[in-house]
């Protein structure tokens, strides 16, 4: 088994960008373990973590502001290679004796793509061209670099776009290598990891499994864990991972809240209970949930009600068990980011994060909270799970409640349940189920006039949401062939009662989120 202490790590200190985890993700793609850490981490804590490299992320702060996010200066003296990105470059510049000012005073702020001109050879830019496209997003500027640093690159509006201190192995870049808009961003991060930090690149999903099993066993000991199965990929992967770690100490509670997809309850019991032998208790709490949701149309209230009631159902079931101390969840890193961190604004309270009451009776276990969705699928495959589970469509904890706009009724739920089943059937039949990241239907709550046969109708409008993405942090709408969309539309209108109109959501993320609520 791989010992956590033996795994090479590059840590990313969080200074507030919504896309900070992309840095860690890119590094993991190179076969190097990486994770986000608070910018408040101390030098002693960094020594204990023992990383081979440190990245200071971007962020919205200004280093000259009174409430600027700071760094323990001793971290810069540990002899560990450091890469400062955007705000991270400005921070290390200010800490080491350079000067940062509002860009308008001496230069220009930059937002968008720009051309980087390299002025010196550098390990950081090895095998990249002298001129390359990068994404800038800064309002402040470095006007004086610290002693011992040299200029490596500049742009037309940024005189210090890349700097380095070779002796101390400290590098600063004013642009964002983690985003796709930076042409050689991956190469730059790879150079930092391998050329500067001397990474081996020997971390894999098998290593992650070993590490998580060790962490789970250390945290749980001989105590018992409850896992809520939602029917989605995430909780299913957590279940198999936990069983591998602690065996019969795990009890899975499958709460049927009346908000599941068509046939989902029976599929969960058959696949995870039958094929994988998980101990699953099925609880029919549909009336309990739907009664509480009656008359509620605010999406945040719906999420909170479902999150709270879900835990109360667990409390009821846990009271029948003995020695249960932990609640496991399939929280992903995208869930955590969308719910906000100490440096990032909350986008929406997430079903696995923000809906839990403060007096919850369990400690949390969230083994997937550093992974993106595609990494969870890779993990599931590494655990020996079949494609029908691993490639199952993502499903939020609140279920169809957040795919019904406005008040939830049995009639609305049925329109989503049946239309979603048709959508999934036709996407699979067209061979698109591996190409489209996520797809589902939404009852918009809007009624419109239609004609069916010789009669006038006034029924619901169903929206189809289908996206393509790499990691779920950003997404674009899927270009489904028109003939496939037409077939889906015709089937839904003809086979699903109380629906007379279909629309297709062509909004990217951002500005929209994947789910409608």
Swiss-Prot record:
CDD domains: GATase1_GMP_Synthase, GMP_synthase_C. One of its GO terms (cellular component) is cytosol. SUPFAM superfamilies: Adenine nucleotide alpha hydrolases-like, Class I glutamine amidotransferase-like, GMP synthetase C-terminal dimerisation domain. It is an enzyme of class 6 (ligase). ATP binds at residues 230-236. Pathway: Purine metabolism; GMP biosynthesis; GMP from XMP (L-Gln route): step 1/1. The active site is at residues 86, 176, 178. The keyword Ligase applies. It holds the Pfam family NAD_synthase. Residues 203-392 form the GMPS ATP-PPase domain. GO terms for molecular function: ATP binding; GMP synthase activity. Residues 9-202 form the Glutamine amidotransferase type-1 domain. It catalyses: XMP + L-glutamine + ATP + H2O = GMP + L-glutamate + AMP + diphosphate + 2 H(+). Homodimer. HAMAP family: GMP_synthase (MF_00344). Catalyzes the synthesis of GMP from XMP. This is GMP synthase [glutamine-hydrolyzing]. The gene is guaA.
């Amino acid at each position: 088994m791989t010992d956590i202490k033996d795994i090479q790590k590059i840590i990313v200190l969080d200074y507030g960008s919504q896309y900070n985890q992309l840095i860690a993700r890119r590094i993991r793609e190179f076969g190097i373990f990486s994770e986000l850490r608070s910018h408040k981490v101390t030098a002693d804590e960094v020594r204990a973590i023992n990383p081979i490299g440190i990245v200071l992320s971007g962020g919205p702060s200004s280093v000259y502001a009174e409430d600027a996010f700071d760094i323990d200066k001793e971290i810069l003296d540990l002899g560990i290679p450091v890469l400062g990105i955007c705000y991270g470059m400005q921070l290390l510049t200010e800490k080491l004796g350079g000067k940062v000012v509002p860009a308008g005073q001496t230069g220009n702020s930059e937002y968008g793509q720009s051309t980087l001109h390299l002025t010196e050879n550098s390990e950081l830019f090895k095998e990249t061209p002298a001129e390359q496209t990068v994404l800038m997003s800064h309002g402040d500027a470095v006007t004086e670099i610290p002693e011992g640093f040299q200029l490596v690159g500049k742009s037309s509006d940024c005189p210090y776009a890349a700097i380095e201190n070779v002796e101390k192995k400290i590098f600063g870049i004013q642009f964002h290598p983690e985003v796709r808009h930076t042409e050689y961003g991956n190469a730059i991060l790879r150079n930092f990891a391998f050329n500067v930090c001397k990474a081996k690149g020997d971390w894999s999903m098998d290593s992650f499994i070993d590490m998580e099993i060790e962490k789970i066993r250390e945290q749980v000991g001989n105590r018992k864990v409850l896992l809520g199965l939602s029917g989605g990929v995430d909780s299913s992967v957590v279940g198999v991972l936990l069983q591998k770690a602690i065996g019969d100490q795990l009890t899975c509670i499958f709460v049927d809240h009346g908000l599941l997809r068509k046939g989902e309850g029976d599929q969960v019991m058959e696949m995870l209970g039958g094929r994988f032998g998980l101990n699953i208790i099925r609880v029919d709490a549909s009336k309990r949930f739907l009664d509480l949701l009656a008359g509620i149309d605010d999406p945040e209230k719906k999420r909170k009600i479902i999150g709270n009631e879900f835990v109360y159902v667990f409390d009821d079931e846990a009271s029948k068990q003995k020695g249960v101390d932990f609640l496991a969840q399939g929280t992903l890193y995208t869930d955590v980011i969308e719910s906000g961190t100490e440096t990032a604004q909350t986008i929406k309270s997430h079903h696995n994060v923000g809906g839990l009451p403060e007096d919850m009776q369990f400690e949390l276990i969230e083994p997937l909270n550093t992974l993106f969705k595609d990494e969870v699928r890779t993990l599931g495959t590494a655990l020996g799970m079949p494609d029908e589970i691993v490639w199952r469509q993502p499903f939020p904890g609140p279920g169809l409640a957040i795919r019904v706009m406005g008040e939830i009724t049995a009639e609305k739920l049925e329109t989503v349940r049946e239309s979603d089943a048709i959508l999934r059937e036709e996407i699979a039949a067209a061979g698109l189920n591996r190409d489209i990241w996520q797809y589902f239907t939404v009852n918009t709550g809007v009624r419109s006039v239609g004609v069916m046969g010789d009669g006038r109708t006034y029924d619901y409008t169903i929206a189809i949401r289908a996206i393509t993405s790499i990691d779920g942090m950003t997404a674009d709408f899927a270009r489904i062939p028109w003939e496939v969309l037409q077939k889906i539309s015709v089937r839904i209108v003809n086979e699903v009662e109380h629906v007379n109109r279909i629309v297709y959501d062509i909004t990217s993320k951002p500005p929209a989120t994947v789910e409608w609520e």
